[in-house]
């Protein structure tokens, strides 16, 4: 099997290349989401795509939803203190860490012991051939119960390869268009 890594990489960022009737399809990333310099010379990442994450981050830094105001506010915080305050407020984000720092972090140590991928056999069955079709996954049926980022990207990539993908979500869960 040969894979053109340029194509594989593009598929993971395909929302940047999508067009609808000739116009670029919007990526719903919030304008204040991003990486900011902190007071201690470190960097802080604020994840603000979901309304509750955005509200928590803005409450902690004490600003309106304005990129310049957030930049100025984050610059008054030490990166680790801001991470802890945002997490305590129910938000998402963190101090940017080096690979060595991540390896020493409790969460980094926890995931380091896990395999990159694990396949769990859930039952016995005879092998089945893939259905015939003009694409590699033609006629394969996929139920997409994912929510953000990697899950929907994988579901879309499966559909691009011919799978019939049905997405199921709940009305109370915030939706981010991709």
Model-found features: residue ranges?
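Acyl-CoA thioester-binding alpha/beta core of soluble enzymes
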Residues: 1-175
